[in-house]
Design a protein with these regions (language model features):
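Gly/Ala-rich beta-loop-alpha elbow adjacent to hydrolase catalytic centers
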Residues: 41-53
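Catalytic histidine-centered segment of alpha/beta-hydrolase-like enzymes
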Residues: 135-148
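Short glycine-enriched nucleophile-adjacent loop
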Residues: 50-62, 68
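Short beta-strand/loop motif that positions the catalytic acidic residue
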Residues: 99, 103-107, 111
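Short alpha-helix in the alpha/beta-hydrolase fold that links the catalytic acid
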Residues: 82-83, 114-124
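Acidic catalytic loop of the alpha/beta-hydrolase fold
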Residues: 76-77, 109-114, 136-138
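A short, hydrophobic beta-strand element of the alpha/beta-hydrolase
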Residues: 68-71, 132
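Serine-hydrolase catalytic machinery in alpha/beta-hydrolase-like enzymes
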Residues: 1-42
Length: 160
């Protein structure tokens, strides 16, 4: 408990999202995030938010999203089949999506919350680019070259 925001709860005995076979309240979280992302061309998710964003992209529930940044994602185990299905379709849009978004996966070898390998597994399913930084389970801080790289990456894709 760092007192942060949680999109869902865990079943008894589970302490990390990637360990859970079920996310309690995930349906409401997916609906709320899809509604909040309506009309957005740029979406950024961090930690649980990145996992949620990965599921929404795989399901085609953010039809206006052209650019997505997933930072500190873990493997969304209860929704693994959604991501694998997206990969197996060649990343083709589903649902309401007509756009295949550019995706940046922001990872850190020093992430002690969601192991880097899990973010890379999400990357293998959704495709896109990977940005590494040394700040752990966080977005790269201002002044870090990785923060500037993230901003440049997003600006170039939004300008396209």
């Amino acid at each position: 408990g760092g007192g942060g925001f949680a999109w869902w709860a865990f079943p008894p005995g589970v302490s990390r999202s990637y360990e859970a076979d079920e996310w309690l309240g995930a349906g409401a979280a997916l609906d709320a995030a899809a509604e909040a992302g309506r009309g957005c061309e740029f979406c950024l998710g961090f930690s649980q938010g990145a996992m949620l964003l990965a599921v929404l992209l795989a399901r085609g529930r953010l039809p206006d999203c052209r650019v997505a940044v997933l930072a500190g994602a873990g493997w969304p185990r209860p929704f693994a089949e959604d991501l694998r299905s997206y990969r197996d379709r060649g990343g083709r849009p589903v649902g309401g999506s007509l756009v295949q978004p550019a995706v940046l996966h922001v990872t850190s070898e020093q992430d002690r919350i969601n192991p880097r390998e899990q973010a890379l597994e999400v990357h293998r399913c959704l495709g896109g680019d990977v940005l590494e930084h040394a700040a752990g389970h966080a977005l790269p801080p201002d002044g870090d070259p990785a923060a500037a790289a993230l901003a440049r990456w997003a600006a170039l894709r939004l300008a396209a």
